[in-house]
Amino acid sequence: MDLFYRLRSGKNNKLLYFVNSYAHEALWHGFYRSWRSILREARRRNDFAAIMSRVNYYCKAPGPQQGNTRAVRNFGRHEAASVYYFDLHKAMRPFGPDTQMRYLPGDVTTVPLLPTLTKSRPIKGDNANSVLLKLNAIRHFISVSDTTPFSAKKDAAVFRGKVMDKPKRMDFFNRWFGHPLCDAGDTSRAAGHPEWKTDFMTIAQQLGYKFILAIEGNDVSSNLKWIMNSRSVAMMPEPEYETWFMEGRLRAGEHYIRLNSDFSDFEEVMEYYLTHQAEAEAIAANARRYCEEFHDRRREYIISTLTVAKYLGLLDPADYQINS
């Protein structure tokens, strides 16, 4: 790993993010490319059908919807974390600051009554009113540099993260904390279970393990994306929530190793894959291929723009048509 990667613990650099975001915000008051121009660009691409498949996945609402809306310019930094503010404004830039919309920041685990732009939504059930955007991307989309072969990694699973007040993580710790096949630790400052408290571990250090636990917290597990981009394997129950990463499309045994929802089979699953490591390595390779879908920044911006355009078409069908 390079020195800069180690110094920032493998996470995205927030200073660079905010410098870039303020610069983009200033451009909004000058030049920005219109969404119709981006739509024309998309239609000229050979992968337009694949792009629209993702657009339709993120925005499932079937037809025009009425209800209260607000202009983009009226969503201020005081209403949510700055990263949500900047990511929203980046997505809305091709439409202008007076565009009317509905937006719900933060970790969203329920479905709004009306079509609304959100970061996350439940996977099961009717989730059409939750229209997904790539929000809080600096936390959830981390690129990792992992050159360590799977065979050279430690024969154990690892977890580092906040545990208290997160029921799924507490369930795992109550069952398996201290098990020899799992290096698990709670890095939160919350009171309770001092025996679970352990030292912080960088992403680079966690990548020294063959298996990394991706246990949902408030909504999705924020480490799942960088695990799947690495040569290690994600272990988790079937996900309950999804984001721009389309966790609902992940398949157990192909993209991640599935655990029971109560984690009762953790030891059994670990012992199986430690004696069938070629299968685990194949899952890691499949996961990396899945992640390649999200690596093309221009393509991702086109998909984001068309997702917003389709959503706005629900509110104002006359002005926003992407299928005509």
Label each PLM-derived region with a short phrase.
Residues M1, N323-S324:
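C-terminal end-of-chain micro-motif
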Residues Q206-N323:
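Catalytic binding pocket for nucleotide-activated donors in carbohydrate/polymer assembly enzymes
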Residues M1-H193:
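Secretory-pathway glycan-assembly enzymes, especially type II membrane glycosyltransferases
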Residues F95-G96, T148-K153, A204-L207, M228, ...:
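Extracellular/periplasmic catalytic domains that process cell-envelope and extracellular macromolecules
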Residues S143-V144, T198-F200, S221-S222, T243:
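Eukaryotic intrinsically disordered and solvent-exposed regulatory patches
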Residues A190-A204:
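Conserved active-site histidine-acidic residue motif and adjacent donor-binding/catalytic loop
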Residues H24-W28, T202, D219:
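Helix N-terminus capping/helix-initiation residues
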